Curated annotation (Swiss-Prot):
This is Probable disease resistance protein At1g58390. CDD domains: RX-CC_like. Residues 144-456 form the NB-ARC domain. InterPro entries: Apaf_helical (IPR042197), Disease_R_plants (IPR044974), LRR_dom_sf (IPR032675), LRR_R13L4/SHOC2-like (IPR055414), NB-ARC (IPR002182), P-loop_NTPase (IPR027417), RX-like_CC (IPR038005), Rx_N (IPR041118). LRR repeats lie at residues 608-631, 843-868. Coiled coil: none annotated. GO terms for biological process: defense response; response to other organism. ATP binds at residues 190-197. The LRR repeats probably act as specificity determinant of pathogen recognition. Keywords: ATP-binding, Leucine-rich repeat, Nucleotide-binding, Plant defense, Repeat. GO terms for molecular function: ADP binding; ATP binding.
Length: 907
């Protein structure tokens, strides 16, 4: 795997050399030679990765190659950036720079020559020490694919004694196969170790299934399978054993015809255990005739397997075991001799066992591993010792042990393409149960070069590509994600505890990053010891109190420095010694919640010319230097600092690559910013018409998210004209003046892709809303006409929030058939609203309703009785008596699981 990750780095370096070839005047020969050397390195690495080598010699060589590639990329990119800075500088700087050109090119030639020498040395070492032979032979007596397949077959046979908590799932699956004529392919999907094979085997051996089907076949699909081999196994299963030799002699065409005819004339069930890729199923399925008596049950970690082209398809996702079932399974393994006649488990030992079970998250295979670890441990001392180190013990089990969860879960990782391996390893940055912001994650991946220019097709954005990567990891059941019902994109994601242990283990194995927790010098055991020099080029601090950059960070080759902070109720952490003179190669710098020394971002920040990602979210800083303008490679810049009226210098003219810009919410009145060159922006937050011209927005045609503060110097008519060409907008937030002196026509919102809309400004006659909206929030709009007749016709709308001053009328009507997709409705602070009519058939999918601080509203509508989807209603305390049990209006809400009041709960 290490070789594959390094190959990915070599490809990035090759692309850089190829794309910028015209910039290497005076060093062409050295660069051409470097490209040849990279090709040679790639050939070694391909052989290494193909054999999945594990020898220490090869690992050391690969690690050295990785360092060479990093150093080469730093040298080449530094040279190119200095050339670019010189060409975009003023006259005086260009004259001064001209005298240094020859010297710089000579130095660059020497640096590239040094890299080539190191490459030659490492290749010579590989040959002289026999490393190449070690790579070719691999040192394995048995291919890994065969070992994995044997493991799965062994596991699939050992299911009965550990069958716990799956009875309901078996019943459902048997029903799909036996009773449901409209279902022909059933897939059981979920993360490794969930018990998919155990479940499939129970279904396969069920009496109802045996009675329903004439023929049964079980095929364990290896990752390196051939179609011919799979078809042979199916035919052998479906026919007599005597024909085995005859079947082995058949070619693919004959196998296809035999199977097609057999499946056309019989009722057969075929189980495919552990299909990994969509393409695998596509290769297998031509043997199945359409609409006949056959059925297929398959297991996979990939949800998308078998979806394409199969109309009669059903995906079944079993849940992890509940705590009671987890404990039952654990007891069977950890205390195999215990039965009803024997004494109960020691109470203290039971408490400790249940605490350790939390690490398993209900994952059956993880529970088995834990039980196996503890089965031979009889004393409390043994259990306490394992309890402390349970994470590392689980992950550190050898892959030769068939009961090892690490082996099963790591298969998911090993199967990933190289770019997704990087994406997954990057998640090791985040602490346990941390909700990872998916938008920020996408930009971090891009800043690290994990997603590159070639990934962006047909106008795709960084967020599009990041989401596609994330969706692939979700399909492979390697991460868990959450998003609001009204959102069209991912909100946050996180790792299951067990998968996070795998992630940390792999990150340590690859020296991917180093983690320091709470204070300098205390480091997570999963990534090494921070008291020794930081070897990794990525460093993350979790909840530091103080960090001295020059003293505490000892790796001048660091590429990523990220600070994560959880407790925002304490004082900001202190950052000292921030000249950044030793960290000039940083690509990612996230200083969340920092308190700068003297509250000034140092001028030296401008020396970090490699920076792609800079975040000062919630930082205590009162001064931003003009040297920020040197950061021409920035794609992500967050200046949403925790300081009012900060002066922001006009530094954006050369930031042509910027995709995300979040400005301070409150800037000094003298701040004037020219943003017209930021034509690649995808997200712009806190744009103010006081500090910038609305005309700057005209060229930002890639914008998907725009948040504007509209001041009196710009009319709504001018703003509408400036944003009319932003055809890709999905999220639009406009906060403006509430003065009634402003024009009252409203905003022209002709955006066909707009999904989220927030309007906080006076526009009493707004009559039009985009048809694809999924969420709308209105405040201080002063609408004179009931907004419901317009909003309820928006077929995709899932969330509506009406806040204080959004509507000034007295009556609202929700018509039957209106709001067909609405799930959330919140109405707060409408002080003139008196009457609300909800007709039967309105809001049929509504789940959450909030009516607060609407003091003139005379009654809650009778129509709530007909909304059976409601799960939660929130009301002010003045309604409590009427809607309590026995109250005169209780009948309106008696079908709703939860009705909450300010200061109390009804149910």
């Amino acid at each position: 795997m290490a070789g594959e990750l390094v190959s990915f780095g070599i490809k990035k370096l090759w692309d850089l050399l190829s794309q910028e070839c015209e910039q290497f005047q005076g060093v062409e020969d050295q660069v051409t030679g470097l490209k040849r050397d990279l090709n040679l390195l790639s050939s070694f690495l391909k052989d290494a990765d193909a054999k999945k080598h594990t020898t220490a010699v090869v690992r050391n060589v690969v690690e050295e190659i990785k360092e060479i590639v990093y150093d080469a990329e730093d040298i080449i990119e530094t040279y190119l950036l200095k050339e670019k800075l010189w060409k975009t500088s003023g006259i005086k700087m260009r004259i001064r720079r001209h005298a240094c050109i020859i010297s710089d090119r000579r130095r660059n030639a020497l640096d590239v020559g040094g890299i080539r020498t190191r490459i030659s040395d490492v290749i010579r070492d590989m040959q002289s020490f026999g490393v190449q032979q070690a790579i070719v032979d691999g040192g394995y007596m048995q291919p890994q694919g065969d070992r994995q397949r044997e493991m799965r077959q062994t596991f699939s046979k050992d299911y009965e004694s550990d069958f716990v908590g799956l009875e309901v799932n078996v019943k459902k699956l048997v029903g799909y196969l036996v009773d449901e004529e409209n279902v022909q392919v059933v897939s059981i999907t979920g993360m490794g170790g969930l018990g998919k094979t155990t479940l499939a085997r129970q279904v396969f051996n069920h009496e109802d299934v045996k009675h329903q089907f004439d023929r049964l076949a079980w095929v364990c699909v290896s990752q390196e399978f051939t179609r011919k081999n799979v078809w042979q196994m199916i035919l052998q299963n479906l026919t007599s054993r005597e024909k085995k030799d005859e079947i082995l002699q058949m070619e693919e065409a004959e196998l296809h015809d035999k199977l097609f005819q057999l499946l056309e004339t019989s009722k057969s069930l075929i189980v495919f255990d552990d299909i990994w890729k969509d393409e695998d199923w596509d290769l297998i399925k031509p043997i199945f005739p359409p609409n006949k008596g056959w059925k297929v049950l398959l297991t996979s970690q990939n949800e998308s397997v078998a979806v394409r082209g199969d109309i009669k398809y059903l995906n079944f996702k079993p849940e992890c075991l509940a705590i009671e079932d987890s404990w039952t399974l654990f007891q069977r393994i950890a205390f195999p001799k215990k039965d009803a006649s024997e004494s109960k488990v020691d109470e203290e030992m039971e408490d400790m066992g249940k605490q350790m079970l939390k690490h398993c998250g209900g994952l059956p295979l993880a529970i088995k591993v834990l039980g196996g670890l503890l089965a031979a441990k009889y004393t409390m001392h043994d259990w306490e010792r394992l309890s402390v180190n349970i994470g590392s013990d689980i992950v550190g089990r050898t892959s030769s042990n068939n009961s090892s969860i690490y082996h099963v879960l790591s298969m998911s990782f090993e199967e990933l393409p190289s770019y997704l391996k990087h994406c997954f390893l990057y998640l090791a940055h985040f602490p346990e149960d941390h909700k990872i912001n998916v938008e920020k994650l996408s930009y971090c991946w891009a800043a690290e070069g994990i997603s590159t220019a070639e990934d962006y097709h047909n106008g795709e954005t960084i967020q599009d590509v990041g989401q596609s990567y994330l969706e692939e990891l979700v399909r492979r059941n390697m991460i868990i994600w959450e998003r609001d019902a009204t959102a069209s994109r991912f909100g946050t994601c996180h790792l299951h505890d067990m998968m996070r242990e795998v992630c940390l283990f792999k990150a340590k194995e690859e020296n991917f990053l180093q983690i320091a927790v709470k204070s300098v010098g205390v480091t997570s055991s999963s990534t090494g010891n921070s008291q020794s020099p930081c070897r990794s080029r990525r460093l993350v601090y979790q909840c530091p109190t103080t960090l001295h950059v020059e003293r505490d960070i000892n790796n001048p080759k660091l590429r990523s420095l990220v600070v994560l902070w959880h407790d925002l109720w304490v004082e900001n952490w202190k950052l000292l010694g921030t000249s950044f003179t030793r960290l000039k190669l940083l690509r990612v710098l996230d200083l969340f919640y920092v308190d700068f020394e003297g509250m000034k971002l140092p001028f030296g920040i401008g020396n970090l010319i490699h920076l792609r990602y800079l975040s000062l979210q919630d930082a205590k800083v009162s001064h931003l230097p003009s040297s920020l303008g040197n950061l021409m490679l920035l794609i992500y810049l967050n200046l949403d600092v925790d300081t009012e009226f900060i002066f922001v210098p006009d530094v954006f003219m050369r930031m042509h690559e910027l995709r995300y810009l979040k400005l301070p919410l409150h800037m000094h009145k003298k701040t004037r910013l020219s943003l017209r060159n930021l034509v690649k922006l995808e997200t712009l937050v806190y744009f103010s018409t006081w500090h910038s011209s609305s005309k700057d927005l005209c060229g930002m045609t890639r914008l998907m998210t725009l948040a504007i503060r509209l001041t009196r110097v710009t009319s709504t008519e001018t703003l509408s004209a400036s944003i009319s060409g932003l055809r890709n907008l999905e999220y639009l937030y406009i906060v403006g003046t509430h003065s009634k002196k402003m024009r009252e026509e409203g905003i022209v919102l002709d955006f066909i892709h707009l999904k989220h809309l927030l309007l906080d400004l006076y526009m009493p006659r707004q009559q039009h809303f985009p048809s694809r909206l999924t969420f709308v929030k209105l405040s201080e709009c002063g609408l004179e006409e009931d907004p419901m007749p317009i909003l309820e016709k928006l077929l995709h709308l899932k969330g509506v929030i009406l806040l204080k001053g959004s509507y000034c009328g007295r009556r609202m009507v929700c018509s039957g058939g209106g709001f067909p997709q609405l799930k959330k409705l919140e109405i707060v602070g409408l002080n003139k609203w008196e009457e609300w009519l909800v007709e039967e058939g309105s809001m049929p999918l509504l789940e959450t309703l909030s009516i607060l601080d609407c003091e003139e509203l005379k009654e809650i509508p009778d129509g709530l009785r007909f909304i059976y989807s409601l799960e939660l209603v929130m009301l002010g305390t003045r309604w409590k008596k009427k809607f309590s049990v026995g109250g005169e209006d209780y009948y309106k809400v008696q079908h709703i699981p939860s009705v909450e009041f300010i200061g109390g709960y009804l149910k």
